[in-house]
Amino acid sequence: MNINVAELLNGNYILLLFVVLALGLCLGKLRLGSIQLGNSIGVLVVSLLLGQQHFSINTDALNLGFMLFIFCVGVEAGPNFFSIFFRDGKNYLMLALVMVGSALVIALGLGKLFGWDIGLTAGMLAGSMTSTPVLVGAGDTLRHFGMESRQLSLALDNLSLGYALTYLIGLVSLIVGARYLPKLQHQDLQTSAQQIARERGLDTDANRKVYLPVIRAYRVGPELVAWTDGKNLRELGIYRQTGCYIERIRRNGILANPDGDAVLQMGDEIALVGYPDAHARLDPSFRNGKEVFDRDLLDMRIVTEEVVVKNHNAVGKRLAQLKLTDHGCFLNRVIRSQIEMPIDDNVVLNKGDVLQVSGDARRVKTIADRIGFISIHSQVTDLLAFCAFFVIGLMIGMITFQFSTFSFGMGNAAGLLFAGIMLGFMRANHPTFGYIPQGALSMVKEFGLMVFMAGVGLSAGSGINNGLGAIGGQMLIAGLIVSLVPVVICFLFGAYVLRMNRALLFGAMMGARTCAPAMEIISDTARSNIPALGYAGTYAIANVLLTLAGTIIVMVWPGLG
């Protein structure tokens, strides 16, 4: 039996789609030196090659893909978006605006200089900035811009062509820039990171190991009684001196949870909770020959929970003001916008931040109730909320505004982005509403993006040879300019106008470009994860601004003549 693969794929859109995805994802795992191609470029290359052979796909699949992707971008940005927009993220907001705004202006100028159409110009902007949200926003606006069918088809083909030709240029140039730009300025990045560490008293070790607290029991002997000198637990400050917390005391056979007024007596058996290294550093008066193994004394449920910051008495406070250790709890991680932050006592908490806290189950629950809520470790997605807000986003995108003979609307991209932000924001405020496991959200976002990339590649593939020969050199030059010049402008603005610490500034610059590989290079150069503070500050707002940039470039293009 002979199987005509070409006819089989042409006759089955679903089969063609998943063949493109499978081959593209395999290609995306290849590495060029230290650079991995990535899923997006892998799927795009395969779809362009198959598009050259005149394979095509139903445009409805393409539309659904970009809608799912942009909605999930909004959901991820939602918990931190408003706190960055309205409060102490002024510098980060300004940096993101400078980065995106300068790239937009430069792209418009180069597009007019080289005589490109809006499709090539917007695609070049998206590729040079390695930003799929720009591509999605521009594509959606083009479809709702009232072009005739043939002109629209050409613009969309050129959009994906411009993206394909400049994506690797943008990625490689930014990674190279992240490696060498810190060496060209007069302040050493490692020194800047250490300066912040000294000012804020935080750990500069990017590879800090995180242990769970353990519980061990000791009998109070004469040396320990002498060491306490009659002081109660509050006066002693056991945690400050030892790094351990007295969780239980057995006295005369009675087990109790001590308060701050308790005074240790000869023969008491105490349960200490702390990290392993804290137990190792205990004074010999605690340890030598004094450890006991008492089932009841050691029978404690030590848990680790992810606590979401929500309540007004925690939002806007510094981490040190929570006094977690005074309540017998230990902080392991601080996560903002899926980015792990340095544990810094001076970090100002935003609504939606996640604190990984360990300790006795009762104490962790008490802390969680005081500052927010324990994240639901559920694998069940609130599909009702997901679908309802998706519908709301589509309805917002249908709204149009009429000015004389000119009309414009938000479009599906902006509508879905706004609805996603609102769902993410409400989830951060109401623990039982709109829950979407991070794994499920990432899967839907990635799948939507891959479907979209497959669609645009198949659509543009037939014209890539002609386009590459005619404008390849121009695209190379434009891609380098749009990728690197806004980074330099952003650096000058942050260093000499905002006067930011260089470690935080370089992290914020990579966040404004939403480029994780470049962020890793900055952290390696600084030998610290302190730049992650800046990266998290600009990342969420940049995702939103980049989507809007895709819409704006299409809307202002006709007015430039």
From Swiss-Prot:
Annotated S-S bridges: none
A Pfam family this chain is assigned to: Asp-Al_Ex
One term of GO molecular function: monoatomic cation transmembrane transporter activity
Source domain of life: Bacteria
Cellular component aspect of the GO annotation: plasma membrane
Stretches that traverse the bilayer: 8-28, 32-52, 66-86, 94-114, 158-178, 383-403, 406-426, 451-471, 475-495, 540-560
Residues covered by the RCK C-terminal domain: 200-288, 292-373
Keyword annotations from UniProtKB, A to Z: Cell membrane, Membrane, Repeat, Transmembrane, Transmembrane helix, Transport
Repeat listed as a keyword: yes
UniProt subcellular location: Cell membrane
GO biological process, one term: potassium ion transport
Main location per the UniProt record: membrane
Cross-referenced InterPro entries: AAE_transporter (IPR050144), RCK_C (IPR006037), RCK_C_sf (IPR036721), Transp_YbjL_put (IPR023017), YidE_YbjL (IPR006512)
Name of the protein described by the UniProt record: Putative transport protein YbjL
Organism encoding this protein: Escherichia coli O139:H28 (strain E24377A / ETEC)
Lineage: Bacteria, Pseudomonadati, Pseudomonadota, Gammaproteobacteria, Enterobacterales
